[in-house]
Amino acid sequence: GVKTVLLLIVGVLGAYYVYTPLPDNIEEPWRLLWVNAHMKTLTNLALFAEYLGSNIFMNTVKFLTSFQEVPPTSDENVTVTETTFNNVPVRVYVPKRKSKTLRRGLFYIHGGGWCVGSAALSGYDLLSRRTADRLDVVVVSTNYRLAPEYHFPIQFEDVYDALKWFLRQDVLEKYGVDPERVGVSGDSAGGNLAAAVAQQLIKDPDVKIKLKTQSLIYPALQTLDMDLPSYRENAQFPILSKSFMVRLWSEYFTSDRSLEKAMLLNQHVPVESSHLFKFTNWSSLLPEKFKKGHVYNTPTYGSSELARKYPGFLDVRAAPLLADDAQLRGFPLTYVITCQYDVLRDDGVMYVTRLRNAGVQVTHNHIEDGFHGALSYNGFKTGYRVEKQYFEWLRENV
């Protein structure tokens, strides 16, 4: 009687909460739905905490995520230590086997929307460990201060300071790294920071040792247009919805919600910055297969006041796609991973187009059945496939 009805109601509500329609080509769809339910629960708890006024949204997400952190434990193959590079906390992974030659170096930057995450998260620790062991590479996995306590450009500056420290001759010698074989890599917001610091490094006369490669894994690269085909198609897709991505972007610059509201409406860029739109105009930068009948809408200009208060969203250090062609020409060998079911897909695809137009050698790996964060979910077949291709590129190019 009543128990059956209650069970039925709970079952229906549970299915409604967990279930989201997914495309046919997604491998292991139920696994993705469970991960998404976990993410939904995290964000709903954070929204509830914010509603109660007990804590702000991002700090709650950060706190709940921190339970996935692991200590810096060495194993039979890799020595793991924590130290600081120029006052920035980093984890260093050094293979234990003897090497007759200098090793390659990889500087890794974690994702998490500039607001959450750390090198200590189990997924990042495992990735760094596997990279060091399988490729015989010294991996430096950096931390950086996070929003909402710290806004742009603090995240960029922390990462840049740590990278510059790693690229010092004496530091590379200490870790047995070949100065001609160092790459930078990052996923999501970490991919954003990797592209940004790689751009800055080219212009920096103080840095004598330059990067050999940059590898960007589903990176966030522009703040100008939140109405790209990938944002339209994947607005409600699991892991990273459009509204959550906009929240992360806006939080990078300020906790003032008026920027978030303007970005959601795609009405945040002032008319005096209209010249920047040519760098993110998807109608000319996306290959046909990514346009799929979408019509380009000329952006509606926003308030000059917002841009005056929070100029970061128009800064090339926050949005690497805003670099002009001359800046892009000096780039190292580049690898870009994009995923079909990801709001950030078109950021990466447009960057590939612009780098190639500037004469940079780029390998673009587009995952037709991929979704945002695939590499971080170690149990997924898609994640293993992405990792395998990423490792192959690093092995051949760093």
Swiss-Prot record:
Gene Ontology CC terms, in alphabetical order: endoplasmic reticulum membrane
Effect annotated for changing residue 24 to K: Inverted topology
Record EC number: 3.1.1.3
Class in the EC hierarchy, top level: hydrolase
InterPro entries on file: AB_hydrolase_3, AB_hydrolase_fold, Arylacetamide_deacetylase, GDXG_lipolytic_enzyme, Lipase_GDXG_put_SER_AS
Bilayer disposition of the protein: Single-pass type II membrane protein
Family matches, as SUPFAM superfamilies: alpha/beta-Hydrolases
UniProt entry keywords in alphabetical sequence: Disulfide bond, Endoplasmic reticulum, Glycoprotein, Hydrolase, Lipid metabolism, Membrane, Microsome, Signal-anchor, Transmembrane, Transmembrane helix
Reaction(s) catalysed (UniProt annotation): a triacylglycerol + H2O = a diacylglycerol + a fatty acid + H(+)
Gene Ontology terms, MF aspect: deacetylase activity; triacylglycerol lipase activity
Biological processes annotated in GO: lipid metabolic process
Disulfide bonds: 115-339
Pfam families to which the protein is assigned, alphabetical: Abhydrolase_3
Transmembrane segments: 5-22
Entry PTM: Glycosylated.
Localisation: Endoplasmic reticulum membrane; Microsome membrane
Short motif (Involved in the stabilization of the negatively charged intermediate by the formation of the oxyanion hole): ranges: 110-112
Taxonomy, superkingdom: Eukaryota
Sugar attachment sites: 77, 281
General function of this protein: Displays cellular triglyceride lipase activity in liver, increases the levels of intracellular fatty acids derived from the hydrolysis of newly formed triglyceride stores and plays a role in very low-density lipoprotein assembly. Displays serine esterase activity in liver. Deacetylates a variety of arylacetamide substrates, including xenobiotic compounds and procarcinogens, converting them to the primary arylamide compounds and increasing their toxicity.
Family, per entry: Belongs to the 'GDXG' lipolytic enzyme family.
The protein's name in its UniProt record: Arylacetamide deacetylase
Gene: AADAC
